[in-house]
Every structure is written in C-alpha cells, then in structure tokens.
UniProtKB/Swiss-Prot annotation:
Its main location: cytoplasm. Belongs to the EF-Ts family. The gene is tsf. This is Elongation factor Ts. It is found in: Cytoplasm. PROSITE patterns: EF_TS_1, EF_TS_2. GO terms for cellular component: cytoplasm. Residues 82-85 are annotated as: Involved in Mg(2+) ion dislocation from EF-Tu. InterPro entries: EF-Ts_dimer_sf (IPR036402), Transl_elong_EFTs/EF1B (IPR001816), Transl_elong_EFTs/EF1B_dimer (IPR014039), Transl_elong_Ts_CS (IPR018101), UBA-like_sf (IPR009060).
Length: 309
C-alpha cells in the first residue's frame, strides 16, 4: 500500500486525543487513509488508546453562562480569543446581559435580534464590543430547558463571577413533589454531578445507537485479537458494553455525592422521601471550547522527521 501524505497537524491531534505514541498515530492514519475516527478505532483495537478519551478537548477562550428563571433555564457560550478577555469586566457584563435575554428569546437566531439596554441588537452589541475590546467575539451557541412542573438545578464550574465560568450545567427534574426546596437541592446536586462526569445521555435508550454499535465493534475486534473463543467473546463484549453504559449514561453512573449508589437509585430514594415521581426531563452541559479546533503552529520541529519519512 502506498503511503499517503499525513499532516503534522493530524498526527499531533490524534496523539492528544488518544494518548498514543506519535509513530503509532501516524501508522493509524496511514492504515485508515487519513480517516480520523477510524484511526482512533484502529488504535483502540490495538490497545494503544484509552477508550475514555473524549472528543472536544481542544479549547477556545471566553465564558459559558447558566441562567434560571423559574421553570425555564438557558445555557450560552460566548467565545473570545484569549482568557485575558474572559476576565475583562466589560466582556463578563456582555455575557450576563446576553444570558438574561436568552431566557426570553428561546432560540439563538431570535436572541441575536433582541434589543439590549443600549438599544442595539445583541449582534450589533457584540460587533461594538469587538471594536472596544480588540478581540474577535462570537455568540457560539445556546440551549434552553423548560419544564411545566418541578425544579431546575444549575451549576457553573470554575466561576470567574457568579453564573459565568468554564462549564455550565442545567438539570430539569419533572415532578409534582410539594417540597420544592429538597427537589431543587437534588437538581443542583445532579447538575454538579453532570459537570464532573460528563454523561452523554439520560438513559441507554436515548444514547446515540451509532456510538453504541461503534463501541461494540471495537470491543469485539479487540477481544478477537486476544484469541478468545466466540462464546467467551460475546460475554466479554456485553460486559464491556454494560461498563460503557455505566460510564456515559447519567442514570447508570455512580452518583458523585454517594458513590455507592447510581443516579437512578438516588432518584428512587428521593421519590420515596418526597412521595412523588421524579424524572430527569433534560440536562444541558456546555464546556467552553469543546469541539473547536485551532491551527497548531509550534510543534513542527517535533514531528517533522516522522511526517516526512
């Protein structure tokens, strides 16, 4: 097979995402004709990459914000070019003001047209701040959480000021429980848990089935390479899938504040205490810069020999 051109950027990014060695990363990219996701799977099958490495670790700067107004909550992300600007009071005030409007706006397109106190639209206000702050600023995304009855818990990790920080989480608990204070406390605890454990779905049925099948295939091929009999492989794969669910499905994760219990068990206990059904209606978790990729400029010397030969 003729060797295709593999860029230094691709090699370094694959190394950062998987923890594998640079030569192994280059080989994986060559073997998969440069397909990044297939290269990750290739390394995992060879036991060269940690399965738990998550996408979206290349960070951008700025702030996320969480805002709750009764039974409505919103999370937004506004990006800047440097962390220095994220600590700028003018920028922080801008993000807070946008978050306050986002609760009413419901969608990001509508939000951009909403008028701020200055009389300018959100979009115009951002452009003006670009000029005064001196960096490119972007209202990147927003998501809204609404419930008809229950409680919304919010948590912001690495706060620079209240409700603004690196990770913002909302958790909506649908319930007709009378003790709203205890329900809100539970929602807050689950929000802290979500910030720390980064679940991918509420339950296994809502988990992306393509992701599940991808994991199943990786586990199967890795077990096969270990030379196990087919009947043993089937049991091993199902065991590993169950473990995978316990790592990425919120209800199956061990609860941060009571590690001997799953989140589902904690909710069951709360239902007994409060005398009402409790359901996680939705959660939102924004981590600053997740999924944003940057051009790398200072690693060419490190990988030149590998990528050229």
């Amino acid at each position: 097979m003729s060797e295709i051109n593999i860029s230094a950027v691709a090699v370094k990014e694959l190394r950062e995402k998987t923890g594998a060695g640079m030569m192994d990363c280059k080989k994986a990219l060559i073997e998969t004709s440069g397909n990044f996701e297939e290269a990750i799977d290739f390394l995992r099958k060879k036991g060269l990459a940690a399965a738990a490495k998550k996408a979206g670790r290349i960070a951008s700067e700025g702030l996320t914000a969480a805002k709750v107004d009764g039974l409505t909550g919103v999370v937004i992300e506004v990006n800047s070019e440097t962390d220095f600007v994220a600590r700028n009071e003018q920028f922080q005030d801008l993000v807070k003001d946008i978050a306050n409007l986002a609760v009413i706006a419901k969608t990001i397109d509508t939000l951009k047209t909403f008028k701020m106190q200055s009389g300018k639209s959100v979009e115009e206000e951002i452009i003006e701040n670009i000029a005064t702050i001196g960096e490119n600023l972007t209202l990147r995304r927003m998501d809204i959480l609404e419930i008809s009855e229950g409680a919304i818990g919010s948590y912001v990790h690495n706060e620079v000021v209240p409700n603004l920080g690196k990770i913002s989480v909302l958790v909506g608990l649908a319930s007709n429980a009378k003790d709203k204070a205890k329900l809100e406390a539970l929602a807050k605890q689950i929000a802290v848990h979500v910030a720390g454990n980064n679940p991918q779905s509420i339950d296994d049925s809502s988990l992306d089935q393509a992701l599940v099948e991808r994991e199943r295939k990786v586990f199967f091929e890795k077990s096969k390479e270990e030379g196990k009999p087919d009947n043993i492989i089937a049991k091993m794969v199902e065991g590993r899938i169950r473990k995978f669910f316990s790592e990425v499905v919120l209800l199956q994760q061990n609860f941060l504040f009571e590690p001997k219990l799953t989140v589902a068990e904690v909710i069951k206990n709360a239902e007994k205490e409060l005398g009402a059904e409790i359901k996680i209606a939705k959660f939102i978790r924004y981590e600053l810069g997740e999924g944003i990729e940057h051009e790398e400029k200072n690693f060419a010397d490190e990988v030149a020999a590998i990528t050229q030969g």
